[in-house]
Curated annotation (Swiss-Prot):
Binding site for Zn(2+) 1: C2, C5, C30, H66
A GO molecular-function descriptor: zinc ion binding
Binding site for Zn(2+) 2: C30, C33, C61, C64
This protein's record includes keyword Calcium: no
InterPro entries: Churchill_sf, Transcrpt_activator_Churchill
Stated family: Belongs to the Churchill family.
Keywords, comma-separated and alphabetical: Activator, Developmental protein, Metal-binding, Transcription, Transcription regulation, Zinc
Binding of Zn(2+) 3, residues: H59, H71, C88, C91
GO biological process: fibroblast growth factor receptor signaling pathway; positive regulation of DNA-templated transcription
Pfam families reported for this sequence: Churchill (PF06573)
Job description of the protein: Transcriptional activator that mediates FGF signaling during neural development. Plays a role in the regulation of cell movement. Does not bind DNA by itself.
Record protein name field: Protein Churchill
Length: 112
């Protein structure tokens, strides 16, 4: 992973969890070949462990194949919620939780 290729290391992305793709706005250019171009996604893998899906892949410079960052995305179901996380030097860090029920219990108002 190369901190010289990104504007900000692990930017906070709130609840935007990417299973694929690249956050190009954070890419300043390849520190090896000095070009700012699209990236390749390589070594993509999907593993399932204990009900959790883990997607990992590498962001590579399209021109010189320099490894810019390693991307990790996870998905799991906990009780009545889907939980997503993302951790990547380039794309950032993020978490999101979404209810699988028609009405989100966190959004219910108390009727007293």
């Amino acid at each position: 992973m190369c901190v010289d290729c990104v504007e900000k290391e692990y930017p906070n992305r709130g609840n935007i969890c990417l299973e694929s793709g690249s956050f190009l706005l954070n890419f300043t250019g390849c520190a090896v070949c000095n070009k700012r171009d699209f990236m390749l996604i390589t070594n993509k893998s999907l593993k399932e462990e204990d009900g959790e899906e883990i997607v990992t892949y590498d962001h590579l410079c399209k021109n010189c194949h320099h490894v810019i960052a390693r991307h990790e995305y996870t998905f799991s179901i906990m009780d009545e919620f889907q939980e997503y996380t993302m951790l990547c030097l380039l794309c950032g860090k993020a978490e999101d939780t979404i209810s699988i029920l028609p009405d989100d219990p966190r959004q219910m108002t108390l009727l007293f």
